[in-house]
Amino acid sequence: MTRPSYTISTDQAKALLDKLWTKASGTISASKAESRIPDEIRDAIDRSIDSKTKTYRYVLPTQLLAKCIEPDVDCRSVQAGSGLSGAFDARSLCHKVVVPFDHVNNNVLGGSSEPYLNNPLRIPAIVRDERQAQKAKAGFDDLCLVLEYAESHPKTAHKLMSETLSAIRLRMELTCITYAVPNRISLGQSLSLADRFLADPTGGLRLQVVAEALFRSIGERFRLFDQVRSASINAADAST
């Protein structure tokens, strides 16, 4: 007999994810103080979110979110036809909820558009029987450990999800790219430099250089000109 599968509400999942994300501390110390999750489980969560296998980073946010929305699902399930009691379609949930969440948060998980279509998750469920098909076996073991804990301790689903989101927020903070701020000077300083540059007589050459540079800058900034070209000087700096 075919076991029934569950459908996870996309709207509920998005709302809960937004709510928990807002509360996520993003700091290890705060997370430890609040969660009461065993250290080995917390460490496995941290390793999964920072996994070198990009696909694995999407697993815990997706699977645990489903468990938070519908406690009767088996959060190890990947496919609705996995054969597990409480099976659901994790790929659809990830694509509709977790992937958009990733995109609006600087692609912190990796920017994948369909992570559950990649080889590591072309399996019916995240169970140890599928370990042999995985290249990153240690990373897969971490996923199994966390999801097994969630199944054996279903009341911890929200805490596990919050812990996962804290790890994601911390990853985002640590991987944030800081761009160098270009040096800038005031208008007065610019005019002073131009005055000093033009003070020496050069037969109009320096004035031409300044004018060309200004037109090039204006053209690039406001997209006014395709090209700026200068011709030979045929006038002196000042009339004689």
Outline where the language-model segments fall.
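Interfaces and regulatory segments of ATP-dependent nucleotide/adenylate/phosphodiester-chemistry enzymes
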Residues: T2-R3, Q12-S190
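Short helix-onset patch at the extreme N-terminus, typifying the N->h transition
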Residues: Y6-I8
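Hydrophobic/aromatic-lined pockets within catalytic cores
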Residues: R169, L198, R216-E220
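Solvent-exposed, charged helical/coil patches
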Residues: L191-A211
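Catalytic centers of nucleases
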Residues: R206-T240
